[in-house]
Curated annotation (Swiss-Prot):
Keywords: Developmental protein, Disulfide bond, Extracellular matrix, Glycoprotein, Lipoprotein, Proto-oncogene, Secreted, Signal, Wnt signaling pathway
GO cellular component: cell surface; endoplasmic reticulum lumen; extracellular region; Wnt signalosome
Location in or out of the cell: Secreted, Extracellular space, Extracellular matrix; Secreted
Functional description taken from the UniProt entry: Ligand for members of the frizzled family of seven transmembrane receptors. Acts in the canonical Wnt signaling pathway by promoting beta-catenin-dependent transcriptional activation. In some developmental processes, is also a ligand for the coreceptor RYK, thus triggering Wnt signaling. Plays an essential role in the development of the embryonic brain and central nervous system (CNS). Has a role in osteoblast function, bone development and bone homeostasis.
Stretches that traverse the bilayer: none
Molecular function (Gene Ontology), one example: cytokine activity
Protein's name according to its UniProt entry: Proto-oncogene Wnt-1
Annotated gene: Wnt1
CDD domains in alphabetical order: Wnt_Wnt1
Residues with a covalently attached lipid (O-palmitoleoyl serine): 224
Species in which this protein is naturally found: Mus musculus
């Protein structure tokens, strides 16, 4: 008789549940570990062509997986681009949600976005999408700027493009950005559960949005600006444009489950398919954000959920929208106070070359959630 059989039934059941949950918990904790390099300095990208020399690591680089470190070694100059793309993504996340209950809070250290990423909710979906998009965007732009040794502009578009224009110039290398982003960002995901599928899908949605928002730019050539012929190239969108699209997709995100209707014993092939929780809804497209868990209300502080609450947040007393005091303060009410502010005003440019301004003081009315 084995030791397991000697245990009381409630003990064996508890142990079994704990052991079953352990891989999922470990996978959740490993997701997004690479975000810890957000503030890394470009000077740490100490790379050489000699395979016998190792990448010099600072503590935050230890958060990268073996594959991620290998990709950094193989692409000199790319570490700064990845870190810069992540910083831009964080700023964009904060901008897009600045007037909502969840305002994309971040913290120093390896757990950049806090405990919310351990939940399969909409906010986690947006975080994964915007950070993936940020890396793809930054790497593609760095290629065309010549900052990465292993890539250049996208020169594949050459020759006539239309009756009065042709391809030329330096197109942003979105293909390299997407490929590197997929290899680097997705390799940080472990497991084969629904959370794993959700994160991979949202990572790809971020990259796809950068690609789909690219636009053609042209320059005219001809006598006296007659624009007889134009030279055109493909240009990346701003990350703000990408963030606007992803924010809209956050609002319309699809709640999903496994393609085999939620069984946690799906085959590998079945795991590659996500289906809407509501059978009446269309399956999520590659552009859509997906989630499987309801979001907290973010109204009050919760250490377990990692939510700060909205107490003390500034609100708009005249707005019926999400930034209004009624919604943002969760019905708790708000306080009003005045603040005297001194700002530069009536600035005048003097030739040459300085600007003179006056200091103007005015009273600002502030509304804060209770």
């Amino acid at each position: 008789m084995g030791l397991w059989a000697l245990l009381p039934s409630w003990v064996s059941t508890t142990l079994l549940l704990a052991l079953t949950a352990l891989p999922a918990a470990l996978a959740a904790n490993s997701s997004g570990r690479w975000w810890g390099i957000v503030n890394i300095a470009s000077s740490t990208n100490l790379l050489t062509d000699s395979k016998s020399l190792q990448l010099v690591l600072e503590p935050s680089l230890q958060l990268l997986s073996r594959k991620q470190r290998r990709l950094i070694r193989q692409n000199p100059g790319i570490l700064h681009s990845v870190s810069g793309g992540l910083q831009s993504a964080v700023r964009e996340c904060k901008w897009q949600f600045r007037n909502r209950r969840w305002n994309c809070p971040t913290a120093p250290g390896p757990h950049l976005f806090g405990k919310i990423v351990n939940r399969g909710c909409r906010e986690t979906a947006f975080i994964f999408a915007i950070t993936s998009a940020g890396v793809t965007h930054s790497v593609a732009r760095s290629c065309s700027e010549g900052s990465i040794e292993s890539c250049t502009c996208d020169y594949r578009r050459r020759g006539p493009g239309g009756p009065d224009w042709h391809w030329g110039g330096c197109s942003d290398n979105i293909d390299f950005g997407r490929l590197f982003g997929r290899e680097f960002v997705d390799s940080g995901e472990k497991g084969r559960d629904l959370r794993f599928l959700m994160n991979l899908h949202n990572n790809e949605a971020g990259r796809t949005t950068v690609f789909s928002e690219m636009r053609q730019e042209c320059k005219c050539h001809g006598m006296s600006g007659s624009c007889t012929v134009r030279t055109c190239w493909m240009r990346l969108p701003t990350l703000r444009a990408v963030g606007d699209v992803l924010r809209d997709r956050f609002d319309g995100a699809s709640r999903v489950l496994y393609g085999n209707r939620g069984s946690n014993r799906a085959s590998r092939a079945e795991l590659l398919r996500l289906e809407p929780e509501d059978p009446a809804h269309k399956p999520p497209s590659p552009h859509d954000l997906v989630y499987f868990e309801k979001s907290p209300n973010f109204c009050t502080y919760s250490g377990r959920l990692g939510t700060a609450g909205t107490a003390g947040r500034a609100c708009n007393s005249s707005s019926p929208a999400l930034d209004g005091c009624e919604l943002l303060c969760c019905g708790r009410g708000h306080r009003t106070r005045t603040q005297r502010v001194t700002e530069r005003c009536n600035c005048t440019f003097h030739w040459c070359c300085h600007v003179s301004c006056r200091n103007c003081t005015h009273t600002r009315v502030l509304h804060e959630c209770l």
